[in-house]
Amino acid sequence: MAAAAAGEARRVLVYGGRGALGSRCVQAFRARNWWVASIDVVENEEASANVVVKMTDSFTEQADQVTAEVGKLLGTEKVDAILCVAGGWAGGNAKSKSLFKNCDLMWKQSMWTSTISSHLATKHLKEGGLLTLAGAKAALDGTPGMIGYGMAKGAVHQLCQSLAGKDSGMPSGAAAIAVLPVTLDTPLNRKSMPHADFSSWTPLEFLVETFHDWIIEKNRPSSGSLIQVVTTQGKTELTPAYF
């Protein structure tokens, strides 16, 4: 791609742009002089533009609000990538008192954001563009100790594969790819698990660089791929998950 080789400024939407990974994406792509918009419940001052998500218990309200505001922001402009890096974690088995609350939270953090990002891709992503979704390696199997998390991430995986199918509504040549990490090396994770083996955690910079490569179509997996992100003794590898 001549444009990529020339270092053309790209346009990217980061859903979850104030989270640990989202903030790194905004920083890194702004440093390349790309136009980067953050979509989150709070503004990211480093972003080129912001869409602030209103907190609500109604999915349709939130989806309509974000869709309308992104539409106003972009107009007829298309973006090169939509990176959905929103999410969170909550534990609990089927007997937990917090089961319903945690399932609700996981659904909002993972499925609401992924579904809205997917719809935004059908409206605003360039042909040949990139949509990434945040899955989880753990959700390739049963997750009895974190029921809500596993269900939500499993749904993200299914969504990703659906978007890759014929007549999904995605732009021509665009790719939907889910990244399935184990544990990301974030300040919050270090604080909550201070005695863990950090050499098995994935550095945020690795994912940022991976997204960059995929945006410029370098080593980009095929649409619908579920890419496991596994770090062992400080070395991170990307491996497709097969069923």
Swiss-Prot record:
State what protein this is by name.
Answer: Dihydropteridine reductase
What is known about its subunit structure? Homodimer.
How would you classify this enzyme at the top EC level? oxidoreductase
Q: InterPro entries from the entry?
A: NAD(P)-bd_dom_sf, Sc_DH/Rdtase_CS, SDR_fam
Which pairs of Cys residues are joined through disulfide bonds in the record?
A: none
Q: What is its EC number?
A: 1.5.1.34
Q: Which organism is it from?
A: Sus scrofa
Role description = Catalyzes the conversion of quinonoid dihydrobiopterin into tetrahydrobiopterin.
Binding residues for NADP(+), per the UniProt record? 13-37
Q: Which CDD domains match?
A: DHPR_SDR_c_like (cd05334)
Which keywords describe this protein according to UniProt? Answer: NADP, Oxidoreductase, Phosphoprotein, Tetrahydrobiopterin biosynthesis
Q: Which residues carry this modification: N6-succinyllysine?
A: K72, K78, K95, K101
Which family is it part of?
Belongs to the short-chain dehydrogenases/reductases (SDR) family.
Q: Which residues carry this modification: Phosphoserine?
A: S172
